Amino acid sequence: MRWVTWASSLLAFLLYYNTMDAGFVYDDRRAILTNPDVTGHTPAEALFQNDFWGTPLADDGSHGSYRPLCVATYRLNYALSGLRPWSYHFLNVLLHCTATALVAITAKKLLPRACSRVGTAVTALTFAAHPIHTEAVAAIVGRADLAACNLFLLSFLVYNEHLRLRDISGKMKGNCLYRSDDFVRARSLSTGDQNFRLSCHGLVQQIFSNFRKLLKAGKMGPLRLISGDGLGYAVKTEGSSKGSESSVSVSEDSELLKWLSLSGALGLAGAATLCKEPAITVVPLCIVYDLLRGYRQNTVHHKNRWRSICLLSTGGVTMLYWRLRLAGAPPTFATADNPAARDPALLTRALTFAYLPIFNFYLLLFPFHLSFDWSMDAIPRITSLFDPRNIVTATFYTIVSKVAWRAIKHEFLRELSESKEIKVYKPRGSCKTKYKSNISRHPHRNLESADRRAYHAPHRDGGGKKLCPCTGCRHPVSEDHSGICRTMNNNNYMNHQSCICAVAVKAKQIKPQTVYNSSRVALLTFLAFMALPFVPASNFLFYVGFVVAERVLYLPSVGFCLLLGLGAGTMTKGWHRNELKSRMFLGSLLLCLLAMCGQTIKRNMDWRDEESLFKSALHINPPKAYGNLGSVLSAQGRTAEAEAAFRRALAHRPNMADVHYNLGILLQNQRRYEAAIKSFERAIYFRPSMALAYVNLGAALASDGRLSEAVSVLRAGTRVDGTRVRDRREHDSARVSALVQLAALHVQRSHWHKALAAYREALQIIPESEVPIVGWTRHSVLTMAGEIYAQLRHWAQAERSARQALAAAPRDAATHLAYAKLLARNASRSLEAEEWFKKALNLDPNNPEVRDQFGQFLRSQQRLSEAAEQLVAAAQLAPSNAARAAAAARALRDAQRCRSAERWYERAAVLSPEDAQSHSNLGAILHLNGKYAAAAAAYRRALQLLPGDEITLTNLKRVYTLMTNQHRT
């Protein structure tokens, strides 16, 4: 069945190949683009101190999602490819392919043998192509679900390997597995109770056994020991003495591998939890699977099974306790995120939360009604018992309960009733039939007959003894050593734990008692696979910040696909009896698969960019979709469409503060200040903690000339309480912006000391690190404060502030440039200033601002030729900047390079055709170069733009005079 694994993984890759050229959409921006843990602005240990979005877990506004391993993969992507999205999408697709392969392996191990072939194929192909996975794969933030699913399945498979090794170990120590006298000899030599009671012959045999064990381990290697092939021969009943002794060595090795695999399962479960919290449910899933798998086993295995379950439970409880303690106080979410959670009516909450799992199951069953967001009222709350959806809820839970109960009834209760009919062991004296096992009287009896009467250790009950019958032949055996036992062990005392019975061996070979023979047990396992990972998102244990999230269904969909595989395999079990029906059924499965593939490809196109994504959800969640679509259209410059989208969103839901704020930004950019002010005021009314609205409201008031009101609003914005805000970095950035704008207003009104106070307050908000607060850094604010000190002529404080900025950002060219400009104000430190200008130029040689400022400094030093070179370079680096072109032309004219200056004046006039000064300057340089006709035309154009300009009129008269004199001569 390896072809199924490879084919399904290949299908998964082909279906999601078209996501490689997608960009960062929706939640990707906050999780990656503005997350300092991803961009490397924080140390590596901060990954284990912050939540998924980069907010410290100790912060009141933390989301509470702790996924450091997932964030570490983002950081690795950033280190390898920066912010190019293709590498992020490629890793997502790769993780989906590996998850598909693991699902195929899991299906092969869990499905009943009779339906394994078709069931595995249906399970793996359905998982690869299911459209519900598009959000998890196409959205980069879905990597948490992808990585968690991979580690979840690996943990389960490793625990399954632990069960296999445990069974092998139990069978080797248990009853009725081997019949050869060679095994009895090897088994006796491996018993720890004989270490000091062996004869000389036994001691030699033990030495040889240990030596053979080392040879076998070296010959087989660790991989074959772990694989089924390496341990499989240990349970064979036929073989030579060499095989028997090897089985003993492998048994002892399997003990170590057994506990290593259990530790590995717990370790993988912990790693999965560090990718996404619902993956911790792999621990109860393994426990449920172990109980379902072991109910048919003999009592010999119970002790080992409960030991594994206890250890697994201890590890799971420890992880859960650590995670809950790490989370601290539960996060708070907005009412719009999960309206039912904030509903005051208990009945509404109960009915709605009972219905939501059915809606999620509907999305798995019919994944053609998908949305990027299901918040707000995308799914109306159930407020009455008479809502028709309650019938669906009751029907669904009734069917699931009945199916589960029938499976339990037919498997477990029947097994219990059969176990009661087993004959209880009786004291030896009460046995009606006497069985003799004196093999010494029949020395020529064949070995198999002797094995049927082998010794089994009696159970003690008080003072009496009960004989333990052979589990294979059900016959009581002798209390004393059998003839074979005495022969093999030189009449030494043996603490036997097993009898040797060929009947039992044959029974074990013919009727293996495993879970794979029961479709009902498989059904219960798959239901657990689907239900347990969904429990953390069900609102039953605690409220979550969403109504429905499609990427959360990535892990539960494994159980759903396994159920589909079980159903398909069961229906095609007798396919050879009716070939027509089987072909029709397989054809319908193929059509369903093709439909899912088509929907997946189509849905991937929706996730290509934000505009297509938001448009795809207009019919499902109109207020959210229109609001986000308006932001995208506004960023693209499509202002009319953006405004229409914002107003449609507000028509559906008028209390959305984000939409009011974004509409205000749009109106502010159009200089419609009155309308913008109203939008910002509504945003503040619906969300008083929205600091960004205060910032932009203050800016709009200042632009409208209402400076006093602007100062009051900005001061209020700096004092907004940020407790439990969704994005603490954005909130702090808004407060810093308010303080910076407040300082600018104070500077405009010449209130220098108030401006300094605002900058000092901003520095208290910004942390003393290189972590940007969404656009604001500590060194940028220190630089602005230094400029204020320079205006006040407090040179010592100005230099101290500049030095602090350099210490905070030693590789920032703008900080070096600011310090150089500060030094240039002091004529005695011009050489030192020139050194700092050169340092800034070395740090950022392609920055036109650095070259422009350096050129201005050189010009002030009367080094005109060098100044012209720097200013021309600045103009070349900013080819669309008319001011830089004009500055380069002036520097060239001062350096007596008038022909070169002419070209740059022409460039400036082309870049700013409506600027009269540009045309006047062009006329002047043409005048100097002797091109009088062209100079007159430039002067006339300048006078058209600025009639009555005296300088231009004077220059034009001079040109006319020169042209007249030239004509006369």
Region spans (language model):
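Polytopic membrane enzymes that build or remodel cell-surface glycoconjugates and lipids
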Residues: M1-D461, K465-H475, E479, C485-R486, ...
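Structural signature of tandem alpha-helical TPR/SEL1-like repeats
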Residues: D606-S612, Q636-R648, N669-R682, L692, ...
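Short coil loop/turn residues that delineate tetratricopeptide repeat
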Residues: S616-P623, N655, S689, T723-R724, ...
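Conserved alpha-helical positions within TPR/SEL1-like repeat arrays
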Residues: K624-A635, D658-N669, L692-S703, R728-V747, ...
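Ankyrin-repeat and related helical/solenoid repeat scaffolds used for protein-protein interactions
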Residues: A887, D894-N955
